[in-house]
């Protein structure tokens, strides 16, 4: 998938041109939530958040989030309830506090502390 290729290779310019694939991915994982496919490695947001280059990760993350927020409107928070956990796992593993600070607002305190104790 072109989206994963852009994320893995840190191609921010390409990611910005893949809005339709970002939304397809967000829709897919949202619709599939709770069907046993909750492995965080299946989420693009995880692969963005775990990048070693924290500045690039934040730029890619903001591109991903802004695309979703613009297109999803009132449904954005419902989607973030599904996307936040795998994104937090990646951000905690990579120590990207900027992404952690944004994503932890979408999960309850117990879920956040579970991620920190498990992956930190």
Regions found by a protein language model. Give the residues of each.
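Long, mid-chain structured domain cores
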Residues: 87, 96-99
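Ankyrin-repeat-protein effector appendages
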Residues: 2-5, 106
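Serine/threonine-rich, low-complexity intrinsically disordered segments
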Residues: 9, 52, 101, 117-120
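Ankyrin repeat domain, specifically the short helix-to-loop turn at the C-terminus of the second helix
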Residues: 16-25, 59-76, 101-113
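Ankyrin-repeat intra-repeat helix-capping/turn positions
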Residues: 10, 52-56, 95
């Amino acid at each position: 998938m072109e989206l994963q290729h852009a994320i893995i290779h840190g191609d921010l310019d390409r990611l910005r041109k893949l809005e339709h694939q970002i939304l397809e991915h967000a829709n897919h994982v949202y619709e599939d939530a709770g069907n046993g496919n909750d492995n965080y490695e299946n989420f693009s947001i995880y692969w963005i958040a775990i990048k070693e280059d924290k500045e690039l990760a934040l730029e890619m993350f903001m591109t991903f989030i802004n695309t979703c927020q613009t297109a999803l409107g009132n449904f954005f928070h419902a989607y973030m309830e599904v996307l936040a956990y795998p994104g937090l796992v990646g951000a905690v593993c990579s120590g990207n506090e900027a992404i952690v600070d944004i994503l932890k607002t979408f999960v309850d305190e117990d879920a956040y502390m579970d991620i920190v104790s498990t992956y930190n």
